[in-house]
Amino acid sequence: MSTVLFVKSSDRTAEEGVSTKLYEAFLAAYKENNPNDEVVELDLHKENLPYLGRDMINGTFKAGQGMEMTEDEKKQAAIADKYLNQFVKADKVVFAFPLWNFTVPAVLHTYVDYLSRAGVTFKYTQEGPVGLMGGKKVALLNARGGVYSEGPMAALEMSLNFMKTVLGFWGVQDLHTVVIEGHNAAPDQAQEIVEKGLQEAKDLAAKF
């Protein structure tokens, strides 16, 4: 039995947002094909996540060094540790996220800030940083209304590229992606584009 963490980063409904459609399609198909796995859902918009700042940075550093912390530092470090430990414990992780203003939603970036911890998800060596999450399987479900996979907009795509870069830095190699794009740019083809992507998500979930 595997523990699978589903991370949802849009608070839009399935009727409003395609990344939520992707999330729900993948989740349902995964549960159907893996009834014995432990599925943990994390809706980032319901978590009230504080931004990474001084107290969290200092607190997590001091905790790692065994140094005395202020009460605010303890509180902030405990918040980051909660999500980091949950992520590390999971055998598989599924991220569903839209492209908003060329990048990921702020809640997802904040969550990733919590996870990027030297000594846990990566380590420093004399040869440079080395990722420590090589045994984790990850799926990225991304939706963007325009076309960013090619052409002049490709250089502006900083959602999927951001997640791939971070996960690669952490050593994740077993990485799978499903992208739905262009449905807003071509409204006459939107239904076909979305349905094709949802089927890809279901197919991936069946073997993930």
Curated annotation (Swiss-Prot):
Enzyme class, UniProt record, top EC level: oxidoreductase
Cite the binding residues for FMN: 10
What Pfam families is this protein classified in? Answer: Flavodoxin_2
Q: Which GO terms describe its biological process?
A: catabolic process; response to toxic substance
Name which cysteines form disulfide bonds: none
Q: Which family does it belong to?
A: Belongs to the azoreductase type 1 family.
Query: Do you know which PANTHER family this protein is assigned to?
Result: FMN-DEPENDENT NADH-AZOREDUCTASE 1, FMN-DEPENDENT NADH:QUINONE OXIDOREDUCTASE
Query: What's the subunit arrangement here?
Result: Homodimer.
Query: HAMAP family attached here?
Result: Azoreductase_type1
Protein name, please? Answer: FMN-dependent NADH:quinone oxidoreductase 1
Q: Which organism is it from?
A: Bacillus subtilis (strain 168)
Q: Which gene encodes it?
A: azoR1
